[in-house]
């Protein structure tokens, strides 16, 4: 696997304390605020006219929750991310034509949100392990492009 046993321990230890539903909504919301061009995939979501509108948008929260629950499931199959995300890769790449760069952006936003929520606990070692994970997930989701 691409993570050492120690790194897996750090990731799982922190992840067990994450409120997946809440963090998912915040991460997706921040993605849409910070990288506004990603909003074009969410035109059916209603009001995305301001940061406040986006962060309180129920559809954004619901999809963010869905996204992070999938990420959570993926963590259980950390040594086979390609397999874990094959169906989602197909959906996002072949059907929705999402630029794989967006998966990387969301991963980086997720790292920011975790740092914000966990403060000192999200130390450099934990961040390094999570950066590997989000890069691995982004790469698995982009798999259909290669």
Curated annotation (Swiss-Prot):
Q: Which residues carry this modification: Asymmetric dimethylarginine?
A: 104
The record's function comment reads: Involved in oxygen transport from the lung to the various peripheral tissues.
- Extra remark: In the cat family (felidae), the oxygen affinity of hemoglobin depends little or not at all on the association with diphosphoglycerate (DPG).
Task: Give the organism, scientific name.
Answer: Panthera pardus saxicolor (Northern Persian leopard)
Kindly list the positions at which N6-succinyllysine occurs in this protein: 17, 59
* Residues annotated for heme b binding in this entry: 63, 92
- MF terms per GO, please? haptoglobin binding; heme binding; hemoglobin alpha binding; metal ion binding; organic acid binding; oxygen binding; oxygen carrier activity; peroxidase activity
Oligomer and partners:
Heterotetramer of two alpha chains and two beta chains.
UniProt key word Iron: yes
Protein name in UniProt: Hemoglobin subunit beta-2
Q: Name one GO biological process term.
A: hydrogen peroxide catabolic process
Q: Which domain of life is it from?
A: Eukaryota
This chain is encoded by the gene named HBB2
As annotated in Swiss-Prot or TrEMBL, what is the tissue specificity of this protein?
Red blood cells.
Q: Is Heme one of the keywords UniProt gives this record?
A: yes
Q: Which residues belong to any copy of the Globin domain?
A: 2-146
Family statement: Belongs to the globin family.
Q: Which residues carry this modification: Phosphoserine?
A: 44, 50
Could you name the Gene Ontology cellular component terms for this entry? blood microparticle; haptoglobin-hemoglobin complex; hemoglobin complex
Instruction: Give UniProt keywords alphabetically.
Output: Heme, Iron, Metal-binding, Methylation, Oxygen transport, Phosphoprotein, Transport
């Amino acid at each position: 696997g691409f993570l050492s046993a120690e790194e897996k321990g750090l990731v799982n230890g922190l992840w067990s304390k994450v409120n997946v539903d809440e963090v998912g909504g915040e991460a997706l919301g921040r993605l849409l605020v910070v990288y506004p061009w990603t909003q074009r995939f969410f035109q059916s979501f209603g009001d995305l006219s301001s940061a406040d509108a986006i962060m309180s948008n129920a559809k954004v929260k619901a999809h963010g929750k869905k996204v992070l629950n999938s990420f959570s499931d993926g963590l259980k199959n950390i040594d086979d991310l390609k397999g874990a995300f094959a169906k989602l890769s197909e959906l996002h790449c072949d059907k929705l034509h999402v630029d794989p760069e967006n998966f990387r952006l969301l991963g980086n936003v997720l790292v920011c949100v975790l740092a914000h929520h966990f403060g000192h606990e999200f130390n450099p070692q934990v961040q390094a392990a999570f950066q590997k994970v989000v890069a691995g997930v982004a790469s698995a989701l982009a798999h259909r492009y290669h």
